[in-house]
Amino acid sequence: QQSKPEDLLKLRQGLMQTLKSQWVPIAGFAAGKADLPADAAQRAENMAMVAKLAPIGWAKGTEALPNGETKPEAFGSKSAEFLEGWKALATESTKLAAAAKAGPDALKAQAAATGKVCKACHEEFKQD
C-alpha cells in the first residue's frame, strides 16, 4: 500500500525535527556556546541514518500540501540536485561521527563542513 501524501509530510517533518535534535548540540559546541556532547559521535551517526532515509518523505504528490516548507523545484526541475543534497549530508554526517571520535578540534572543523551542506540545501530548497 502506498503512503498517503499527508503521512509523508508528517514523516518528513519528523525527520527534520530528528535532524535538528541531533545537530543542535553539536553545532552549539562547534560555535563555542555549549559543552562537547558526550554522545556526539552517536548523534552524527543518527544524522547520517536520517539523511539516508529522508528522501522517502519528499515523494511526488507531497509538494502542494499545506504546511510543506519545500520549494516545488525539489520535486521537479531540481529533484536530482535535492537528492544529491541528502547524499552529501549523509556523507558529511558520517565524517562528523569519525571526527567526534578523533577529538574536539576535528569535530569543530567537520561541523563547519556539515553545517555548510545543511545551509546550502536550506537556501536552495526551503520556502521562506
Curated annotation (Swiss-Prot):
Disulfide bonds: none
GO CC, one annotated term: periplasmic space
Any one GO BP annotation for this protein: electron transport chain
PTM section of the record: Binds 1 heme c group covalently per subunit.
Entry keywords, A to Z: Electron transport, Heme, Iron, Metal-binding, Transport
Gene Ontology molecular-function annotations: electron transfer activity; heme binding; iron ion binding
Domain of life (superkingdom): Bacteria
Residues involved in heme c binding: 13, 17, 69-70, 118, 121-122
Pfam annotation, one family: Cytochrom_C_2
Role summary: Cytochrome c' is the most widely occurring bacterial c-type cytochrome. Cytochromes c' are high-spin proteins and the heme has no sixth ligand. Their exact function is not known.
Subunit organization: Homodimer.
Identification of the protein by name: Cytochrome c'
